[in-house]
């Protein structure tokens, strides 16, 4: 029984140590996240970017959304062309 408890304790210790080592491998400073697994591997995403499809980009660009300014201009254009 003591041998099993020692084995479980060692496994838990190994998992904890590996979990603590993960941030060491991130080469990006501060709050920047590391992203990419291709030619740009290890690219650091800035504060306004995040990792999307293994590349640093903005939320808008990643999800193909439209910002409020573009939407407003398109509505104004539509209103001008319908009169």
From Swiss-Prot:
Protein name, as recorded: Turripeptide Lol11.1
PTM characteristics: Contains 4 disulfide bonds.
Family: Belongs to the conopeptide I2-like superfamily.
Signal sequence, renumbered to the chain: 1-27
Written domain comment of the UniProt record: The cysteine framework is XI (C-C-CC-CC-C-C).
Subcellular location: Secreted
Task of the protein: Acts as a neurotoxin by inhibiting voltage-gated potassium channels (Kv).
MF GO annotations: potassium channel regulator activity; toxin activity
GO cellular component: extracellular region
Reported tissue expression: Expressed by the venom duct.
Keywords: Disulfide bond, Ion channel impairing toxin, Neurotoxin, Potassium channel impairing toxin, Secreted, Signal, Toxin, Voltage-gated potassium channel impairing toxin
